[in-house]
Amino acid sequence: MDINQLSEILKKKFFDTKIIEYLEIEDKSYLHKSHINNDPSKFHIKLKIKSKALENMTRVESNKFIYRLLNKEMKNYIHSLQILFI
């Protein structure tokens, strides 16, 4: 899977929840290419999310929601996930 395919999957999952107003996905994998244990098949993703529903949750609740939503992708394609609420 490449980053474009993964981004499309993530967008679909987030927008299918009907609670996301804005989503930006940024591939930060290039920052880790020189690391000894870097796996090129797993991505370092930064998410910028705007969602009133997630804003009304605690930080722990909103992160749990996102990690449950992306469970399969976290296991198979994402090495690290940075979440910013805007």
Predicted feature residues:
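N-terminal, polar/charged subdomain of small-to-medium soluble alpha/beta proteins
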Residues: 1-86
